[in-house]
Amino acid sequence: MAAATASSALKRLDLRDPNALFETHGAEEIRGLERQVRAEIEHKKEELRQMVGERYRDLIEAADTIGQMRRCAEGLVDAVQATDQYCARLRQAGSVAPRVPRAPQPQPPSEKFYSMAAQIKLLLEIPEKIWSAMEASQHLQATQLYLLCCHLHSLLQLDSSNSRYSPILSRFPILIRQVAAASHFRSTILHESKMLLKCQAVSDQAVAEALCSIMLLEESSPRQALTDFLLARKATIQTLLNQSHHGAGIKAQICSLVELLATTLNQAHALFYTLPEGVLPDPSLPCGLLFSTLETVTRQHPTGKGIGALQGEMKLCSWFRHLPTSIIEFQPTLRTLAHPISQEYLKDTLQKWIDMCNEDIKNGIGNLLMYVKSMKGLAGIRDAIWDLLSNESASHSWEVVCQRLLEKPLLFWEDLMQQLFLDRLQTLTREGFESISNSSKELLVSALQELETNNSTSNKHVHFEQNMSFFLWSESPNDLPSDAAWVSVANRAQFASSGLSMKAQAISPCVQNFCSALDSKLKVKLDDLLAYLPSSDTPLLKDTTPTHQPKNSAFDRYADAGTVQDMLRTQSVACIKSVVGCIQAELCTIEEVTREQKDVLHSTKLHAVLFMARLCQSLGELCPHLKQCVVGQCGGSEKPAREARALKKQGKGRAQDVLPAQAQWQGVKEVLLQQSVMAYRVWSTALVKFLICGFTRSLLLRDAGSVLATATNWDELEIQEETESGSSVTSKIRLPTQPSWYVQSFLFSLCQEVNRVGGHALPKVTLQEMLKTCMAQVIAAYEQLTEENQIKKEGAFPMTQNRALQLLYDLRYLTMVLSSKGEEVKSGRSKADSRMEKMTERLEALIDPFDLDVFTPHLNSNLNRLVQRTSVLFGLVTGTENQFASRSSTFNSQEPHNILPLASSQIRFGLLPLSMTSTRKARATSRSVETQAQVGPPALSRVGDPTTHPGSLFRQLASEEDDSPAPSLFKLAWLSSMTK
């Protein structure tokens, strides 16, 4: 408010009349008015300056440039005119008085004045020149000008203790400010020079000039310069490692770090290394640049070829000729001589610097690699380092530099980074496979929960899992590949599979989905890791040495490929074993839960057990990328395995000849197979327990009705016997031709349940174990029967010879069906065989020995014929060696046999084994117990429908058969004879 009042009052005053001003105001008021006027002037100046500077900046700069050019031109004109005048005076003096005796001249005082004036003029212009040199990064030129400025101060006595009483300062007060400003140049030049040392993208000459500036300003030695240079580069390394991390910038940071290390050693060689005596210099490898630059700057050049402080347009000024010689030829000097650094000291210093930076670099790069989340990113960084160092090695003779400086090669990758990359790679691989393992476990648990909900109508796949036969006999669009019509099998994709192939292997959709999800995750992980490994055409485990590398290669990028492959193999095996461990834990839980349950076969827990069994059985086939993870890129083909098998067959193969990767893959497959067999064992144990329970119950029924209900067809045979007198007597005997109904029900139910789970794809060992268990339980049931028969019970049907004969026939039939001849040959006489023989002896003891001798050949014939006829019906539980009749010379052509007839036209049921149309006329048959066959067998199957009883379909077909002579390709003689 006061300022506004004073300004308005000032405007009302007429300042142009000083008399009136002094008349109306006192001295103090006039001084106040003066201050106000000056403040107003300064304010207006500032406003005008801002306005003009904002709007006419370019114009002002152009005007300044034009003014400077005008002054320079005027100076040139004045210098030319002065030269002309001087020459004219010389000519006049020569023509008038050729030889004039030297007279005392009055010029020395004026010349001294001009010299001092020129020095003052130079002193005033040096700050601008220094700033210009600093802006152009010419630190050595700025240092020379600063040292020249200090020299001028000493000449003009501006820096002496009595400088304020100097006559020059008294006449030129502006020099006081100039002296004060010059004192800051030293710290500024030093700071800028040391900052330049921290930059890696600068030339060797620029670094040499910066080091020379530091040495001249600090009066240091070359050893101190080497220390300053290395400390500056160490600070740059710290700065690079501590920058913010942003994804792709990590590659640039690490590459910049490697480039900085390589540049530091190259510049250390170019600056500080000196060649021994007698060694010719190599133009492509400069060295000793610091010492040559120092010598050029500091030594006196009588010919004027040195680098002077005063250069350029300054020499064209008119006052330049008045400068003394000490200023014109000024050269900075060092207090101590710059002796070259010895090679031993240079090597020790550089090695200490490398060791000092080694720990920082490892920690820094390790922290940087924590931000790399993929192995493809690691491979990109490694390849970028390889490209950088390869170019460095090719263009700068890297090996020669390292040999000269360190007397050994400096291996950036092998010594500093390779282990860091391997550690990060191992971490990423472990985390990736742990994630795959955890997600697979979660998927497994969810699949098991879905199977145990018993809501099969909501999910068709779950319905297929509960009954594999529905899946096998249902059609789907994926049964055949979409390109099956025009693409051959050889040209299809490696892992392509059709729906029919899945059905042929009894692989359910749930298992397919699980394996597909697991394989897709493994594929992503494998594709990511393959970027770190050599391509497929490069041998993976080849022992590569640096001597086999290309000449310009910095290091072997794939030297650790074997380690990476082992790491991948270890983690993938651990992943799959973790999944198998989860399956094993689930199996143990289910086994403990179902151990005490009676109706286990109907439990939903068994669906989960079968799912896990199929899963373990199919993982090796449906997850091809799992095999690639374990075996490697070149292990996908089966050629090595085939060759190994061929050698083994020839007796040349040995166990140690198998590759470790192949052996480990075989180990994984065995673990999966063992777990699958364990799961199937849980199912087969429950199945056998359920079926044997019904079989034993029917076998132990001793009342007459039950015995008649389980009886089947017997044959009457006429035999001729020779009496003691030599005459022949014809007699009739009756022998069983079919097993009891509960035996057929037991076998048929067993086949049904095996078919329900896809029995054609069950492991052979599972079927063998199941049949062994069945046989052992059957023998135990018969042992229990014989023990109970020894105890007389009221109302029990006595053990007659006919019943004993039927029991013997049943037992021998079960033995022939459930036993495997191949296994018997391999294992020799087993415990079950001895029990079987004892049981057979007990039953034979109930039959008359004479009758037994007569019955045995015919009984054996009936058994063999029955086994052949039922080999198709019970094919899944009979061994393959039992499905074909052995060739014998006693073959009866009148017997029907199971062969497929040749037909010229397509028959309706092409897959049914049709017998020949011949009939058994030679053998007299009787159907005395035909009525017993019409009685239904006891209900042993878990379904109450009578159509599911064994033999019901064949009885229906036989009842429809008539004796019509009309020819037909579909004859049911073999079917009807099975039911007789």
Swiss-Prot record:
One of its GO terms (cellular component) is Golgi membrane. One of its GO terms (biological process) is glycosylation. The modification N6-acetyllysine is found at K598. Pfam families: VPS51_Exo84_N. It is a peripheral membrane protein. Keywords: Acetylation, Golgi apparatus, Membrane, Phosphoprotein, Protein transport, Transport. Transmembrane segments: none annotated. InterPro entries: COG1. The modification N-acetylalanine is found at A2. It comes from the Eukaryota. Residues 923-950 are annotated as: Disordered. It is found in: Golgi apparatus membrane. Residues 923-934 have a biased composition (Polar residues). The modification Phosphoserine is found at S7. Disulfide bonds: none annotated. Required for normal Golgi function. Component of the conserved oligomeric Golgi complex which is composed of eight different subunits and is required for normal Golgi morphology and localization. Belongs to the COG1 family. This is Conserved oligomeric Golgi complex subunit 1. The lineage of its organism: Eukaryota, Metazoa, Chordata, Craniata, Vertebrata.
